Regions:
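Non-transmembrane, aqueous-exposed alpha-helical and coiled segments at domain scale
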Residues: 1-129
Length: 130
């Protein structure tokens, strides 16, 4: 289990990418599509925000768990990019039916709350998850 205990952007995704060959199941159990992480696989660069980086390991099962906050629009873009490159998500990606969804209203609320903080704002990514 790898946990990020800061504000994010600690390099968790790259560490998971290094560790994935040693495991059969790679699962995201919480979090959302904030900044994402950039990985290079077979000479191509990919930005993953929702899909676990084990997707590049041909025989691994990847899980998006019920604690994950999933933006369906960003997820679809990410999935299309991976599919165009030959990564078959249908056989190797499992999404919990209890995963939370980010809706456009969440992004609007996020922006309004951040604006209301004035000089005390924390610099949200504006993705609707705070």
């Amino acid at each position: 289990m790898l946990l990020g205990l800061q504000w994010g952007d600690e390099g968790k995704g790259k560490i998971v990418d290094v560790l994935t060959p040693s495991y059969d199941i790679i699962a995201r159990f919480q979090g959302g599509p904030n900044a994402g992480h950039t990985l290079e696989f077979e000479g191509e660069k990919y930005i993953l925000r929702s899909i676990p980086s084990g997707i590049f390991q041909g025989d691994k099962i990847n899980v998006i768990g019920n604690g994950v906050v999933l933006d369906p629009i960003l997820f679809a873009e990410e999935a299309r990019a991976l599919s165009r490159s030959g990564h078959d998500l249908r056989k190797r990606l499992v999404i919990s039916r209890k995963a939370h969804l980010i809706l456009p209203t969440h992004r609007m609320i996020d922006a309004a709350q951040e604006a209301a903080k004035g000089g005390a704002k924390i610099g949200t990514t504006g993705k609707g998850i705070g």
